[in-house]
Amino acid sequence: MAYEQEVWVPVTGLGKKVMAGEFASFDEILASGQPIKEAGIVDAMLPDLVDEVLCIDMMQRMTDSGRRIKFRAVVVIGNKNGYVGFGQGRDVQVGTAIKKAITNAKLNIVKVRRGCGSWECGCGMKHSVPMEVTGKAGSVAVTLKPAPKGIGLVTGDVGKKVLTLAGIQDVWVNTSGNTRTTLNFAKATYNALRETNLIRIGGRK
């Protein structure tokens, strides 16, 4: 889903460095360890990002002045080549909730380590995950296991959308908990992908 972007005027030190061209790649920004607090930084360094709205929920709350309704949007973004982000946004307008979710996802973008971790394959290409990883959110746990080339994404539709935008083509997926909850299923899948960059090959962090 495409939204017209406003002209970005950086306000943080990192944003000003990006605008000045001091970073050659997004990897350099991540390696610097500086927190990303502006979505414009991500837009500037990863212009090929695609966003996918996973669900929109109506939330009601009773107040002294009556019932108030807000919408919650859950969004995943990625460039289908090793970067993925997950975000939520709330607002009284659906469109604004989606925009907030996209911005939140950009601030939560992570690099996904890909590889060929299946003993059945060994092609050496970056089509799967390099090791088994698990992510959790609420009652949901999602475990990603390396799969040989050609297997595809063995998971539900929500998981497929998250994995596809991350650039994963083949993976076995085990789940537990209430996976019918789109928010937790998507977030657990995202958290599992984030683990690929936190766990060293060999199993130790």
UniProtKB/Swiss-Prot annotation:
HAMAP family: Ribosomal_uS5_A (MF_01307_A). With S4 and S12 plays an important role in translational accuracy. NCBIfam families: PRK04044.1, uS5_euk_arch. Pfam families: Ribosomal_S5, Ribosomal_S5_C. Residues 49-112 form the S5 DRBM domain. This is Small ribosomal subunit protein uS5. Keywords: Ribonucleoprotein, Ribosomal protein, RNA-binding, rRNA-binding. GO terms for molecular function: rRNA binding; structural constituent of ribosome. It comes from the Archaea. It comes from Methanocorpusculum labreanum (strain ATCC 43576 / DSM 4855 / Z). SUPFAM superfamilies: dsRNA-binding domain-like (SSF54768), Ribosomal protein S5 domain 2-like (SSF54211). InterPro entries: Ribosomal_Su5_D2-typ_SF, Ribosomal_uS5, Ribosomal_uS5_arc, Ribosomal_uS5_C, Ribosomal_uS5_euk/arc, Ribosomal_uS5_N, Ribosomal_uS5_N_CS, Ribsml_uS5_D2-typ_fold_subgr. One of its GO terms (cellular component) is cytosolic small ribosomal subunit. GO terms for biological process: translation. Belongs to the universal ribosomal protein uS5 family. The keyword Thylakoid does not apply. Part of the 30S ribosomal subunit. Contacts protein S4. The N-terminal domain interacts with the head of the 30S subunit; the C-terminal domain interacts with the body and contacts protein S4. The interaction surface between S4 and S5 is involved in control of translational fidelity.
